[in-house]
Design a protein with these regions (language model features):
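Conserved SAM/AdoMet-binding glycine-rich loop
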Residues: 2-190, 195
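Auxiliary Fe-S-binding modules of radical SAM enzymes
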Residues: 44, 49-88, 117-118, 122, ...
């Protein structure tokens, strides 16, 4: 029913990072596949204008679907390259007072749609399939991985698989989880790399280097996003300049300066990593201590 009213969606985003701890993990995977998000699944964008018109006729949220239909009609008009067709569609929109939201009416939408429909439908039929993706947005727990779970993840259109790597204490477990998934054919990974928490600055360097080296060793892609820790509660919850016990303001500023250059992301490529963070741990600290302005 949701698909009928709102149209099919390309991607599936799951916000619960405890899925692996669930006793019904296998059932969750089966539900994802049954919903059309199995490995290799594709998606063709539905005719959202047709859906908007149907919902208007059912009087389902008139205000919202009047706005939606008008936006789709205007977007279609702006995409037209043929001058004759462009003028025809513009005339239909103008005559029905759809060029301004203040003058747009339900009947005006209906009238313009009758003119636009055959051309719009033709464009929809030309749409090509796109790959679907499943994203466990909060990341899954490397400590819970088993070969069976890796095999199950490989059955769905997961892209990328986010595996948390919050500290060096889970290094071996994390590397094992990545290798299990790679053996099942998964090649796209991502994670947030927490820093400025209870970690030491060198831990950030080591975790990033591990990811880059895994990319080279296993021929996979891991995109790392260093994420500065900030307390949500207690006396530091409103302190935007919070500094962890093992960190200092200079170190934090230096890391942020490097991330500004890398656009916040570190992917595969040892040479790029070495230029950004140093070839050795000593070079990393040299970068952290480098003057802000050269």
């Amino acid at each position: 029913r949701v698909r009928e009213i709102c149209g099919d969606q390309r991607d599936l985003l799951l916000m619960d990072n405890n899925v692996m701890a669930s006793k019904r993990f296998d059932d969750i995977i089966e539900d994802i596949i049954a919903s059309g998000f199995g490995a290799g699944a594709t998606y063709i964008e539905p005719n959202m204008l047709e859906i908007a018109i149907k919902n208007l006729k059912k009087e389902t949220n008139d205000r919202g679907y009047i706005k939606k239909a008008r936006t789709l009609l205007l977007d279609y008009y702006k995409s037209i390259k043929d001058k004759e067709l462009s003028y025809k569609i513009y005339s239909a929109l103008e005559e029905n007072h759809l060029m301004r939201i203040e003058t747009t009416t339900k009947q005006g939408i209906y009238n313009a749609y009758e003119v636009v429909k055959p051309y719009y439908d033709k464009k929809v039929k030309l749409r090509r399939p796109k790959r679907r993706s499943v994203d466990f947005n909060q990341g899954v727990d490397a400590r819970l991985f088993t070969p069976h779970m890796a095999k199950q993840f490989a059955r769905i259109a997961i892209n990328p698989l986010r595996i948390a790597f919050d500290n060096m204490a889970i290094k071996d477990t994390y590397v094992s989880a990545i290798k299990m998934c790679q053996q099942e054919g998964l090649r796209k990974f991502s994670n947030y790399i927490l820093y400025n928490f209870n970690d030491e600055p060198i831990d950030l360097y080591r975790r990033l280097k591990i990811n880059v080296e895994l990319c080279e060793e296993l021929d996979i892609d891991i995109y790392s996003f260093p994420m500065k820790y900030h307390p949500l509660f207690d006396e530091h919850s409103h302190d935007r300049n919070y500094i962890g016990k093992q960190w200092n303001m200079k170190y934090v500023r230096s890391v942020q300066a490097v991330l500004n250059v890398t656009k916040g992301c570190i992917g595969r490529g040892l040479s790029f990593f070495y230029r950004a963070f140093g070839r050795t741990e000593k070079e990393f600290f040299d970068i952290l201590l480098m003057p802000d302005a050269m």
